[in-house]
Amino acid sequence: MARKLMVALAVVVTASVAVLQGQGKRAAGPSVDVFKSATCGCCAKWVDHMRNAGFAVHVSDLEEPELQKIKGRYGVPASARSCHTAPVEGFTVEGHVPASEEKRLLKEKPAVVGIAVPGMPLGSPGMEVSGVKPHPYNVLTFDKQGATTVYSVQKP
């Protein structure tokens, strides 16, 4: 009886350690501060996408005038703006950028201010709609002068 109890206890402890280690790895990714509107459901879905990709995400809900000031402060050109802004490791991420493209940005470290998915294209992370065909969209880089360049074409 004591042996069965010890085996069961060992299984529980091992499983608990594995779960805790997995949580630690998930939160150990790059830290992202997301500035968004409290009423934007698609932004909340994008935050979930980022967390699921291993990013440590902190969210600040702002009123629209403050959100626009943040976009200006982080150098997002008007032509590249979307619904949320997220500084990460010295870069600015604007809109529904896939986590894979953010990881690429952090690995390559191009000489840009940031990357953006202008607008809210269907099929981008957080903008998935059941029964609606996703649209191809561009991920853009932007520089200090506000010039944009296609970084990648997404075909969900």
PLM feature segments, named:
Residues M1-K4:
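Positively charged n-region of N-terminal signal peptides that target proteins for export
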Residues A8-S16:
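Bacterial N-terminal signal peptides
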Residues S16-A27:
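Bacterial Sec-dependent signal peptides at the C-terminal "C-region" and cleavage site
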Residues R26-A53:
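Local sequence-structure signature of Cys/Sec-based thiol-disulfide redox active-site neighborhoods
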Residues G29, D33-S37, V59, P65-K69, ...:
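Mature soluble domains of exported/periplasmic/lumenal proteins and thiol-rich metal-chelating peptides
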Residues T39, W46, E63-E66, P98-E102:
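Stable alpha-helical elements in mature extracytoplasmic
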Residues A44-H84, V88-E89:
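N-terminal, post-signal-peptide region of Sec/Tat-exported proteins
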Residues G72-P156:
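Thiol/selenol-based redox catalytic cores and closely related redox-interacting motifs
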